[in-house]
Design a protein with these regions (language model features):
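Glycine/small-residue-rich loop that forms an oxyanion/phosphate-binding "nest" at active or ligand-binding sites
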Residues: 18-58
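Transmembrane helix exit motif
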Residues: 5-15, 50-75, 163-164, 186-200
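Hydrophobic alpha-helical transmembrane segments in multi-pass integral membrane proteins
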Residues: 34-39, 89-96, 130, 185-200
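Membrane-interface helix caps of multi-pass small-molecule transporters
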Residues: 33, 37, 41, 64, ...
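Interfacial loop-to-transmembrane junctions
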Residues: 162-182
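Small-residue-rich hydrophobic segments that form or flank transmembrane alpha-helices
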Residues: 1-23, 83-88, 98-159, 163
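Cytoplasmic-side transmembrane-helix entry/capping segments in multi-pass membrane proteins
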Residues: 19-28, 50-52, 74-84, 117-120, ...
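Membrane-interface helix termini and inter-helical loops of multi-pass transporters
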Residues: 36-45, 134-146, 193-201
Length: 218
């Protein structure tokens, strides 16, 4: 993934908001370090469920409750710090830092190229922070490196096509598409969580019934 990050960062090297990154990256780095130190204490499923709730409420509010949705929000230090910290933490623990990042960046209504470039630069920085911890925890090895290199040509093609599409899509269509994707992806995370929970409950119930049945027979 880091190779794709470098290629994307090079492509958007002149299209990003440096001031926004100066706020977000340090807090996200702290979040990633905390995640590296504590990830074994947290369930990835529960973290993704929480992110699903956050993303669903965020996108639902945009589509159905917010007035003047196209009006840019002012940069807020506290909101940026909190969202970035959560993004760094969940990026390490659940590989899902996109939702908290979007919650801060999307309302700013940056020009679409600047939004994408800022997001790319942000995650490139965070992945660099995470890399030494992944190596230490053996989460990155020669096998995963070879796999990443094998997918590199496809990544380059995807980056090229994505950049071309970004240039032709209208600003409002772009933002509505992003919010729609967040809504759908968040709903899926919530559904997946409850499906897995139901499956576990059903398994426990079946085990309980089996025990009761055996006791009854004896």
């Amino acid at each position: 993934m880091i190779f794709s990050d470098f290629i994307s960062a090079f492509r958007f090297r002149k299209e990003f908001d440096l001031n926004t990154l100066k706020l977000m990256v340090p807090f996200a780095a702290v979040g990633a370090i905390v995640g590296a130190s504590t990830f074994s204490f947290f369930s990835e499923d529960y973290l993704k469920f929480i992110l699903g709730i956050m993303g669903f409420l965020f996108s639902f509010h945009y589509f159905f409750l917010k007035k003047d949705a196209d009006k840019p929000a002012k940069k807020n230090f506290m909101k940026g710090a909190i969202c970035s910290s959560i993004a760094g933490f969940t990026s390490f623990c659940a590989h899902s830092g996109g939702t908290p990042t979007s919650i801060y960046l999307l309302p700013l209504r940056l020009r679409k190229e600047i939004y994408v470039g800022t997001r790319i630069m942000f995650f490139t920085c965070i992945n660099l922070v995470k890399l030494p911890f992944y190596i230490h925890l053996s989460m990155v090895n020669s096998s995963s490196l070879i796999h990443s290199l094998a997918l590199l040509p496809l990544s380059v093609f995807g980056i090229f096509v994505g950049y071309k599409l970004l240039k032709v899509i209208k600003e409002n269509v772009f933002y509505n598409a992003i919010y729609t994707l967040i809504l759908v992806a968040s709903a899926k995370l919530i559904i997946d969580f409850f499906y897995a929970l139901w499956f576990r409950v059903k398994q426990i119930a079946l085990v309980g019934l089996s025990i009761v049945s055996l006791n009854y027979r004896t």
